[in-house]
Amino acid sequence: MATTLHSFIDIFDTTFGEGPEAVQLKTIIIPIIQRDYAQGRKGSDVTRVRGRFLESLYKAVTEKPITLDFGCGDIDVEGNMTPLDGQQRLTTLFLLHWYAAKKSNISEENYEFLKKFSYETRYSARYFCIDLVDYKPKFKTAISKEIVNQAWFPLDWENDPTISSMLVMR
């Protein structure tokens, strides 16, 4: 089995395999069998781990790249990847890229790859990711409060553990 390094951005343009079995990755779909996104949970242990992980990601962006070892999953013939391991890291990278794109106010074509990341754990998480990519925050208040106050955000989404964890990561 060959191992190659990819950024979260370029993985969507990568072809895996060779010959007639080669397939270009089009989407990453967190499957229904995966647990909820947990890196945004509250609690001292999770907060400590999250802080260390975010610090590592910050250093990777500002200093030296790091390897996150998350490339384990199946890719079907249509190019849809269902990760078997690394869902937490992939979701954090999705959120990091979303935040950086929106904060930097880059053009939509430069962050369209985020639309290729999806959740199947429950419909609310799937639609939250879709709506989040389209949302243009103002950054005048806490981003999580700003998101929750949007017309596209149903109040019952606050009860979805994946969404509430994503909001903590902001």
Predicted regions and their residues:
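Glycine- and hydrophobic-rich flexible loops that cap the catalytic core of alpha/beta enzyme folds
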Residues: M1-R170
